[in-house]
Amino acid sequence: MDIKKGDLVLVISGKDKGKRGKVISVLPSEEKVIVEGVNIVKKHTRPNAKMRQGGIIEKPAPLYRCKVMLICPHCNQPTRIKHTFLEDGRKVRVCSKCKEIIDRV
């Protein structure tokens, strides 16, 4: 997957369109990501050993990765990602707009 934990992303479709957030976790087998502060759902819980008191908990739910776009840390714009190899053979992610290296893969 092109998106990794800790990346800043922009939601491009759905009820939270236009919101930005940091990726909390990535679920590669399902091709989903969990973004901080986006797609918040309410979960009703019963009392158990961990939580003495039940109640309604708000937590972020996963989004399909096609609904988010990476924000380049250099040009601060949503961008697609290209992959290139450095001279020493390492594979890196590159911003399509500003051609800067985003980070090591």
Swiss-Prot record:
UniProt GO cellular component terms: ribonucleoprotein complex; ribosome
SMART domains: KOW (SM00739)
Gene Ontology biological-process entries: translation
GO terms of molecular function: rRNA binding; structural constituent of ribosome
Keyword Ribosomal protein: yes
Pfam family, one: KOW
Keyword annotations from UniProtKB, A to Z: Ribonucleoprotein, Ribosomal protein, RNA-binding, rRNA-binding
UniProt keyword annotation of Signal present: no
Residue ranges of coiled coil: none
Described function: One of two assembly initiator proteins, it binds directly to the 5'-end of the 23S rRNA, where it nucleates assembly of the 50S subunit. One of the proteins that surrounds the polypeptide exit tunnel on the outside of the subunit.
Subunit structure: Part of the 50S ribosomal subunit.
Family: Belongs to the universal ribosomal protein uL24 family.
Designated name of the protein: Large ribosomal subunit protein uL24
Organism expressing this protein natively: Dictyoglomus thermophilum (strain ATCC 35947 / DSM 3960 / H-6-12)
